[in-house]
């Protein structure tokens, strides 16, 4: 997609990973991405655009106006999504309202997440995870935080090649934060 449309559109990706560059770079290198990837350790993107899960797609026109926002299950390899984006690029169409899928973020959960991130950055992983689990108790639909906990506790399910979505679904059914 990028090779075909890089003259018409700028593409960046944003990886939300609390563990940072060391966990993100192997994927970037494996995919041989030709566009920049920003690393969001603090989930600023989730707060800014109102999402609790990934992957997402947000298209911003040359005037800085968001004209497309798909929250969850964004995959450029999906034929329907690819067609929408091609139409947006070639015809400058507004595809979806910015407010169409904005999710209510819970301030107490965000504050607990940020406090946990402070402990994580101080290498107190155990206390960080405790705060993040409290955040999930308040906001059980926040899959970004939930999956980061899982990735820290079970790195082999996330960082050794293919992400194990079956394991994640089983874990989700068993968990009761």
Residue ranges and their predicted role:
Residues 1-15, 26-30:
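Conserved helix-turn-beta segment immediately C-terminal to the redox Cys motif
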Residues 25-62:
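Short, internal strand/loop/helix patches
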Residues 29, 136-137:
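Conserved structural position within tetratricopeptide repeats
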Residues 61-130, 143, 153, 157-158:
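Thiol-/selenol-based redox modules, centered on thioredoxin-like
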Residues 94-95, 151-177:
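Alpha-helical linker/edge segments of TPR/alpha-solenoid repeat scaffolds
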Residues 113, 146-149, 164:
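Alpha-solenoid helical repeat scaffolds
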